[in-house]
Amino acid sequence: MTSVKTIAMLAMLVIVAALIYMGYRTFTSMQSKLNELESRVNAPQLRPPVMSPIVPLNFIESEDLDKELD
């Protein structure tokens, strides 16, 4: 009976070690992806940001706005 307990204990240790290794790999993978994203965000812009073609409402004259609403 002790050999069964020993085998079960070894199997449990192998499973726990595999889970720890998989967690470590996931953590390091996420860390490298976050570092890559941070370097992309901090990279100098090659071109200026694109301005939106939509004109804000505060630039439209109130008369023009009234005409559009009619």
UniProtKB/Swiss-Prot annotation:
Keyword list, A-Z: Host membrane, Membrane, Transmembrane, Transmembrane helix
Membrane-related topology note: Single-pass membrane protein
Domain of life the protein comes from: Viruses
Annotated compartments: Host membrane
Transmembrane parts of this sequence: 4-24
One Gene Ontology cellular component annotation held by this UniProt entry: membrane
The keyword Membrane is assigned to this record: yes
Name of the protein: Uncharacterized protein 011R
